Amino acid sequence: MTALAYYQIHLIYTLPILGLLGLLTSPILTKFDIYKISILVFIAFSATTPWDSWIIRNGAWTYPSAESGQGVFGTFLDVPYEEYAFFVIQTVITGLVYVLATRHLLPSLALPKTRSSALSLALKALIPLPIIYLFTAHPSPSPDPLVTDHYFYMRALSLLITPPTMLLAALSGEYAFDWKSGRAKSTIAAIMIPTVYLIWVDYVAVGQDSWSINDEKIVGWRLGGVLPIEEAMFFLLTNLMIVLGLSACDHTQALYLLHGRTIYGNKKMPSSFPLITPPVLSLFFSSRPYSSQPKRDLELAVKLLEEKSRSFFVASAGFPSEVRERLVGLYAFCRVTDDLIDSPEVSSNPHATIDMVSDFLTLLFGPPLHPSQPDKILSSPLLPPSHPSRPTGMYPLPPPPSLSPAELVQFLTERVPVQYHFAFRLLAKLQGLIPRYPLDELLRGYTTDLIFPLSTEAVQARKTPIETTADLLDYGLCVAGSVAELLVYVSWASAPSQVPATIEEREAVLVASREMGTALQLVNIARDIKGDATEGRFYLPLSFFGLRDESKLAIPTDWTEPRPQDFDKLLSLSPSSTLPSSNASESFRFEWKTYSLPLVAYAEDLAKHSYKGIDRLPTEVQAGMRAACASYLLIGREIKVVWKGDVGERRTVAGWRRVRKVLSVVMSGWEGQ
């Protein structure tokens, strides 16, 4: 078998895997990922070059001469050009594996509860110095590279690895190996996967004589009788150092995300590359303890969404960390306010609760704004016209009112149940990043919900707040389109350079997001027709049953004759109905699919219509938006394909199917629905 030259090792073994990892990570790779990997490449290149030059001059390893036909292209400081390429390739491979292994994690959840003192950190970093001394003080009879020194490679390795690794471990080791948040497993995977692969590549290369390790400079233990143990240790320890360096970057980002308001006060926070901001660096190296409350708030939000909004939480892994943590806080606020207003056991006066939330919005954002250019307000052809008081696509947002921590604490203490304080604090962190109007729309949707469950009089009169398709779509705009619009503003805050320049362009993106949010709400309504009816909630338009004239906007259906008897069947499920309950009788035949499928079809039309606008979002959030939409629309597909027998039971999607769908959409882009 012909021996391989060094460059051929790259062509066959390292560059293909690098290309594959680049392909896999390209939809989710962020500027911050590129930034931190680039930092590590620079450090690896700068630190390893003099070290490698030194061990080559001391005869630790050699490469074939040009005359052998396996020679290298050339050298600089005695180091082959191909070796310089290896410095870069290994760091990037490990960095991309780290991105894949940690993308599903929220950086802030791994922050330690307490900070070590500066003296403690310094002592931890100095611990390895005596160990290094023991290795480097080992007697060597001569500096001549031909002289036997079996500990040379191991000593050299300890000199290269130990100081930076111990410093990084002292600063961010506890963060990188946090078991509670799951980061430790991802850290170990990010170290071991590239390590095992590169050890195998080295095994092949040494066996092929692509390069040679001097037997006189190693202890003599070989893996498989071929690869010196020092080579395996090199890959393990350098990958440990790389991953700890990447973890330190994420550590600073976590401090920025959780404690940015403490650092910057009411000033606008920078949106990218938090490592280079002196205030964040000062907090990273500071021995001052920081509040554990922001982390606890985020933990409670994650727990809430894992229990009540699993589809969103799984899909949110497609967003960059900065956007994702803000969206988790925003979505948790929406869930909490829904519970506050909608649950009698939580709030005995839901209208007063709506007033309380509105007052909180005034505290954060000031009074409602009115459109500066009403003629610029756009509407979707598939949705009702936007409310005339809706502001146009404002950017940048006007400065928010000044809000001191004491004012926030006072409001929460006096007016919000203590178990929900976390969600209000998380929304307060978005002050200045999102507008008020979509949240006012959300409250308008809650007001519609308060009409349910229907009174006995309303049941007898066949009267609901959702009379026509336009009413249904307006409700969807309020409770879901508004949240999607807020998502756009959160994404713009993370990438201000990618915000469309004109009002018309911004409005097009916002309208597309409202279409998508409404589409997802229609899927939820289609899924929950029976469950909602048993709670006295009726979101199907009365016009579906021929009980009202349809609006100009009409969801196409398969029937032409009025079907008021079907609405009566639904009413019989309501707790306030005086009609005989027929749910368990032989005569109860409600064709659930007949009414759910038109909603799903219209939702898919809305989603498709929104794709062009959604694709104009900042590049880094597009994968997350696709994932969120696909996760919800999968429920619609479940209704169409899997729902058998018109039983009307609530459909859920298996977790593994949801994850598979999210991954496929993130990697491939929009798919035909």
From Swiss-Prot:
Keywords: Carotenoid biosynthesis, Isomerase, Membrane, Multifunctional enzyme, Transferase, Transmembrane, Transmembrane helix. GO terms for biological process: carotene biosynthetic process; carotenoid biosynthetic process. InterPro entries: Isoprenoid_synthase_dom_sf, Lycopene_cyclase_dom, Squ/phyt_synthse, Squalene/phytoene_synthase_CS, Trans_IPPS_HH. Residues 258-673 are annotated as: Phytoene synthase. It is found in: Membrane. Bifunctional enzyme that catalyzes the reactions from geranylgeranyl diphosphate to phytoene (phytoene synthase) and lycopene to beta-carotene via the intermediate gamma-carotene (lycopene cyclase). The cyclase preferentially catalyzes the symmetric cyclization of both ends of the substrate to produce dicyclic carotenoids. Beta-carotene is further processed to the acidic carotenoid astaxanthin. Induction: Down-regulated in stationary phase. This is Bifunctional lycopene cyclase/phytoene synthase. The chain crosses the membrane at residues 9-29, 36-56, 81-101, 117-137, 157-177, 187-207, 226-246. Pathway: Carotenoid biosynthesis; beta-carotene biosynthesis; Carotenoid biosynthesis; phytoene biosynthesis; all-trans-phytoene from geranylgeranyl diphosphate: step 1/1. PROSITE patterns: SQUALEN_PHYTOEN_SYN_2 (PS01045). The lineage of its organism: Eukaryota, Fungi, Dikarya, Basidiomycota, Agaricomycotina. Residues 376-399 are annotated as: Disordered. Its EC number is 5.5.1.19, 2.5.1.32. One of its GO terms (cellular component) is membrane. It catalyses: all-trans-lycopene = gamma-carotene; gamma-carotene = all-trans-beta-carotene; 2 (2E,6E,10E)-geranylgeranyl diphosphate = 15-cis-phytoene + 2 diphosphate. It is a multi-pass membrane protein. Its main location: membrane. Residues 1-251 are annotated as: Lycopene beta-cyclase. GO terms for molecular function: 15-cis-phytoene synthase activity; intramolecular lyase activity; lycopene beta cyclase activity; squalene synthase [NAD(P)H] activity. In the N-terminal section; belongs to the lycopene beta-cyclase family. NCBIfam families: CarR_dom_SF (TIGR03462).
